[in-house]
Amino acid sequence: MNRLAKTDYSRWRMLDEDGKHTWHYLDDDEAARTWPQTLADKYYLGLPLDLPDLPTATSPLDSAINGLKFFSKLQLPPGNWGCEYGGPMFLLPGVVIAWVVTETPIPQAYAIEIKNYLMARANPVDGGWGLHSEGDSSVFGTSLNYTVLRLLGVDSEHPVMVQARGLLHRLGGALNAPHWSKFWLAVLGVCDWEVVNPVPPEAWLLPDWVPVAPWRWWVHIRQVFLPMSWIWSKRWTAAETDVVRALRRELFVQPWESIEWAAHRNDIAPTDNYHPKSWLLNSVNWILSNIWIPYLRPRSLATRAEDWVSKLIDMEDANSDYADLASVNGPLNMIVCYIRDGPDSYSVRRHRERMEEFLWVNKEGMLANGTNGVQCWDTAFLIQAVWSAGLAEDAQFKPMLVQALEFLDRQQIRENCQDQGVCYRHVRKGAWAFSNRDQGYGVSDCISEALKAVIVLQKEADGYPQLLEDQRIFDAVDTLLTYQNPSGGCASYEPTRGSEYLEMLNTAEVFGRIMVEYDYPECTSAVLTALVLFSKHWPDYRREEIQTFIQRGVDFIKRAQRPDGSWYGSWAVCFTYGTMFALECLRSAGETYENSEHVRRGCEFLLSKQREDGGWSESFQSCEQMTYIEHPTGSQVVQTAFAIIAVLSVDYPDVEPIHRGVRMIMSRQQRNGEWLQEGIEGIFNKSCAITYPNYKFIFPILALGKFGRKYPHLV
């Protein structure tokens, strides 16, 4: 009873259809024979690669070349690179619950490997699950992942379940879960809807001028709130099953029948309460629950709101061909379509197909990615890394880079959204998304990094095809120029639309800084460096606007510097990441260690954090606590590369500490050229860590190559 099944990993294949990644399990021997496993498949799955040792690197540039030789073998046929984008432990539950309540068959191989992944990720000390894979156990993670395992057939008396249930009960049971968990359990029928704080669709009927109107919110929270509000308003619950009845007994510390659900709407365990509800949100929830909904809410208004929300959901689906923004709103949109259109409708069938792209298989099992991948993002960075290392004209890497350029060519978004203004979407013509063109959301730094990658190959390297004509480059720049906020900084998906005071209405509880867009030093820096590079080759295009944009952006970067000289990074770990971007930005504006106090302070901050072994060590906890915290396992290859790139970019004069960091990175390289996985690299919303496993190749290659070009005599 205690041992779980395992699939035959030699039968898994990852299919890349021009950036659309799906995993397939081949039961049929003939199918497995005719579709052989690739080296990339084996790498993702943790299978032996049996690659020969490379010649021992005798210089940093040799080490960069060895790393690139290994990483080039992982390039996928369309020209991009793939990887898991995991870490958050609340994503799989949304996918699995959506499958269950929409009568979507779950392939046996999927069920087996999801169970294996969750078992592998259970906290080895207390048996629970956290917000993310490296976080402390929480009611959010434990209640939802316990539920997933039970839905997939794990017995309640399995030792893992017994331990997890014991922890959950010590934390107060599922009534102490945050809002999102209570919502999912209500959809499933494990909780009563009375325990879920209001998610009124009427908010979408507010005039655009209202300061709290949802169009002003950050795109991820508004696209999650959108289907949530429709489902909440319908109070829809899936059909009751034996497993649901069992979960009602298992997830709570009191008899299910005796629970006064409304009295527990605001209950939350201290482990989960990262962003406590404000007095304003509590007041709004009380008024909605006790006055508006029972006494004042006209059914006609609710219907009108539901109809408008339904149309907005359809626009989101249409503008992404059902790929949707990410792996939280995608499953929710599918549930809406199932309730509204029926299980056999085109909308549900297409959602089922596209949800496959959120899934990934690694050596531990099957997980859900944070989006449908990081394809454009990683590919753009890799191109720039090879260029910066001086290897773009090396014949052995040119075919790889041509393929990568062709991928970015095909992935550029060529048109704005249908009904762009109606569905509150930002301009996107000429943009690149984080993952692929289908997903369709331009992001300021994704556009910038892809644009830089295209320009360095088409304008600065010899012998590359001119795939993007000038007008397409101009389209990207035109879109970039829409991202600057009045502060001079740039946000992510769109300029800031609302006040930071909207955080007082943050209902998620487990995340911070999610209600509106913010100025991000790394996004601002990416845009500015892209515009500087663009202006080098097209100096007359929108010259004055670009110069003004750059100056205002540089002023923002300087203001964003913290008293200790660092910059906070919101999208990766953390101060090393943010400081790398900021220093590269200042260098693009002509500032170096010699002539800029801001640069000197940034370098001094980084050098103050260097460890005895030459490396840098930073934990995701830096992002949570907004102060530099070292990783408990010591120096990290990725953060060391960030720091080296930063100080090299601004001509830090003392080569000795940089050389020590370079030697540390070289010492971690395996004989086949790879670097092994270390601590989690990414973060979002201050509190949730997420993986960027290709960073351990891209940034060390960039750091080593950059150092090797600048100091070719040092080994």
From Swiss-Prot:
Alphabetical keyword list: Endoplasmic reticulum, Isomerase, Lipid biosynthesis, Lipid droplet, Lipid metabolism, Membrane, Repeat, Steroid biosynthesis, Steroid metabolism, Sterol biosynthesis, Sterol metabolism
The protein's Enzyme Commission number: 5.4.99.7
Single GO molecular function: lanosterol synthase activity
Gene3D superfamilies cross-referenced by the UniProt entry: 1.50.10.20, 6.20.120.20
PROSITE patterns: TERPENE_SYNTHASES
Biological process annotations from GO: ergosterol biosynthetic process; triterpenoid biosynthetic process
Pathway(s) per entry: Steroid metabolism; ergosterol biosynthesis
Active site: D445 (proton donor)
PFTB repeats: 111-153, 550-590, 599-640
Signal peptide residue numbers: none
Family: Belongs to the terpene cyclase/mutase family.
Note: In Aspergillus, the biosynthesis pathway of the sterol precursors leading to the prevalent sterol ergosterol differs from yeast. The ring system of lanosterol in S.cerevisiae is firstly demethylised in three enzymatic steps leading to the intermediate zymosterol and secondly a methyl group is added to zymosterol by the sterol 24-C-methyltransferase to form fecosterol. In Aspergillus, lanosterol is firstly transmethylated by the sterol 24-C-methyltransferase leading to the intermediate eburicol and secondly demethylated in three steps to form fecosterol.
Role noted for this protein: Lanosterol synthase; part of the third module of ergosterol biosynthesis pathway that includes the late steps of the pathway. ERG7A and ERG7B catalyze the cyclization of (S)-2,3 oxidosqualene to lanosterol, a reaction that forms the sterol core. The third module or late pathway involves the ergosterol synthesis itself through consecutive reactions that mainly occur in the endoplasmic reticulum (ER) membrane. Firstly, the squalene synthase erg9 catalyzes the condensation of 2 farnesyl pyrophosphate moieties to form squalene, which is the precursor of all steroids.
Name used for this protein in its record: Lanosterol synthase erg7B
Organism: Aspergillus fumigatus (strain ATCC MYA-4609 / CBS 101355 / FGSC A1100 / Af293) (Neosartorya fumigata)
